[in-house]
């Protein structure tokens, strides 16, 4: 859809602001590459940009209102504003409303259509407002430019969309059905990332372990086969993946954790709740016991694996006793890190129309208790790492002279001082643990 408005000069500088998940970070990087390929330059820190792309997230409540707040803050002191594009999942879900409520927005583009961003920006500069929220994911990836320079850690989207339809979640409606990118495309993009400087690649998907394809010999493979193929790249030192669903943890993927040295001992495997009635109401298609049994198999394959999870407190109808089941599950697992949220009703999802919504004050109290338990376990995991010697991938400089920051194999933030360069793999002895990071020294 398009409409006419007064024309403005073609933008020469841009800024992409991404919110939310790691896939949004990946999408934001690809949008920046698209714009740079058209001859535009990224605006420096503190500089005004001719074009601002708000790459939005729709998972949490009030996401749409946050977009309008961000749009308002883009108006400059002299009353002018940059050309504004709204991208991402809020654009997908609320695109027409954004165009109606925010005349300063010239472009609305969904997460499966952002390959069209350059031509939509050109139309906007010529006075045409436009909205594009189709879902041609395959066409999107085919149209994106080749990867060039990369940081030491890089994201690679291998799968998009979700077919699980958890009752609280908007992803199937904003990202669409599950699609897997072709094996050959992923191997090519990974090689380009490594050639550009990446030493660690995180494979991304809304349901990443549902990825399926055929290898270069036409044989059907899953995510474990893709990881094995990427591990053959000599200069790629580490492989991670996120986010996974328990029902798609195959025997092959579990085995890969015990067999592939480059597949890091870290797994983000959300459970969301520890009570079976709540899990059924969420349409999670697993029980607390089946989740725990799965973790036993994973730990048997890789005993030192660090586990991460997601939790929702206050799902409609959740009782005090049912919440206590979640706390018991947390105690039994001992997560290395995890993320917890209050239930947030999303328009259009089945859970939004369920009865017996939990009062906010009750959700607040449950979240506080759950987060305290998760923080306790994260600190305990970090303290148990003290005395270990491990490889750390150096990602950036620290706040202090001579200090470096990087990640351990277990995704812990590690800071140390000494001779190093960004992108180096260095051996570090872990000497002191805090709740969110570990200090070390070069071994």
Curated annotation (Swiss-Prot):
- Which residues are involved in binding [4Fe-4S] cluster 2? 162, 166, 169
Q: What does this protein do?
A: Catalyzes the methylthiolation of N6-(dimethylallyl)adenosine (i(6)A), leading to the formation of 2-methylthio-N6-(dimethylallyl)adenosine (ms(2)i(6)A) at position 37 in tRNAs that read codons beginning with uridine.
What is this protein's record name?
Answer: tRNA-2-methylthio-N(6)-dimethylallyladenosine synthase
The answer on whether this UniProt entry bears the keyword Cytoplasm reads yes
Q: Mind telling me which Pfam families this protein's record contains? A: Radical_SAM, TRAM, UPF0004
Cite the MTTase N-terminal domain residue spans from the record.
Answer: 12-126
- UniProt gene name: miaB
Give the family this protein belongs to, as stated in its UniProt record.
Answer: Belongs to the methylthiotransferase family. MiaB subfamily.
Tell me the HAMAP family matching this sequence: tRNA_metthiotr_MiaB
Note the subunit structure: Monomer.
> Per UniProt, where does [4Fe-4S] cluster 1 bind?
21, 57, 89
Record-listed E.C. numbers: 2.8.4.3
Subcellular localization is given as: Cytoplasm
- Co-factor binding comment: Binds 2 [4Fe-4S] clusters. One cluster is coordinated with 3 cysteines and an exchangeable S-adenosyl-L-methionine.
Q: Which Gene3D superfamilies match?
A: Methylthiotransferase, N-terminal domain (3.40.50.12160), tm_1862 like domain (3.80.30.20)
Instruction: Provide the catalytic activity annotation.
Output: N(6)-dimethylallyladenosine(37) in tRNA + (sulfur carrier)-SH + AH2 + 2 S-adenosyl-L-methionine = 2-methylsulfanyl-N(6)-dimethylallyladenosine(37) in tRNA + (sulfur carrier)-H + 5'-deoxyadenosine + L-methionine + A + S-adenosyl-L-homocysteine + 2 H(+)
Picking any one GO molecular function of the record gives:
4 iron, 4 sulfur cluster binding
